[in-house]
Amino acid sequence: MELATESIEGVLLVDKPQGRTSFSLIRSLVRLIGVKKIGHAGTLDPFATGVMVMLIGRKFTRLSDIMLFEDKEYAAVAHLGTTTDTYDCDGKIVGRSKKVPTMDEVLTCTSYFQGEIQQVPPMFSAKKVQGKKLYEYARQGLSIERRFATVTVNLRLVKYEYPRLHFVVQCSKGTYIRSIAHELGNMLGCGAYLEELRRLRSGSFSIDQCIDGNLLDEPEFNVSPYLRDANGLILQPAPVL
């Protein structure tokens, strides 16, 4: 375990493993470095992987609100023909369809997700309505009226092999990728849920800058060489040999 000193501060870019919660990674980092002042620039669902921006120390946790507003980029897979109550692979199956959309239909529907669109947050989300998170209502079997939100997206179809539709999307803050998968399913008339999600970029930070999140569970792992400033520059560059 590293000694908790004022020098342990900065931005740590982590590739979140599948199956881990975002907060379990934060807890692992707290245990590893002994610094409790740790924030983030956006969480990921347990089934998702990819860029998690961890902010260590008061100087950097103050940047959280700014970084949360930055655009993000995701690679995703929508599973057609099945719908779930959460719009993703962790939910309960609530519908099935035998319809197999054509490529022309897929191209037409995916072209809708360009520029500003109106999106309704899913019931199984942390969005608050009347001071209560939507998923708390959902777990009680309640469906609450939600307001449309305007978000900006740029979706690119990568591959379509039924039942899987692969796409990459750049989006603004507050965009729900599983809602995009759900809406695609509705537009195609077959239903869909989000099967895979990988965050490729958060603001200016990309996946190729990240360390494996499992390293945070290694007691002797030294995070210092991987700490960056707010612009992504390494704070302690490796010495030139």
From Swiss-Prot:
EC number(s) from the headed UniProt entry: 5.4.99.25
Domain of life: Bacteria
UniProt entry keywords in alphabetical sequence: Isomerase, tRNA processing
Positions of the catalytic residues: 45
Pfam families: TruB_C_2 (PF16198), TruB_N (PF01509)
GO molecular function, one term: RNA binding
GO biological process: mRNA pseudouridine synthesis; tRNA pseudouridine synthesis
Catalytic activity: uridine(55) in tRNA = pseudouridine(55) in tRNA
InterPro entries: PsdUridine_synth_cat_dom_sf, PsdUridine_synth_N, tRNA_psdUridine_synth_TruB, TruB_C
TM region(s), chain numbering: none
Annotated family: Belongs to the pseudouridine synthase TruB family. Type 1 subfamily.
Task performed by this protein: Responsible for synthesis of pseudouridine from uracil-55 in the psi GC loop of transfer RNAs.
Classification via PANTHER family: PSEUDOURIDYLATE SYNTHASE TRUB1, TRNA-PSEUDOURIDINE SYNTHASE
Protein name (database record): tRNA pseudouridine synthase B
Organism taxonomic ancestry: Bacteria, Pseudomonadati, Chlamydiota, Chlamydiia, Chlamydiales
Name of the gene encoding the protein in the UniProt record: truB
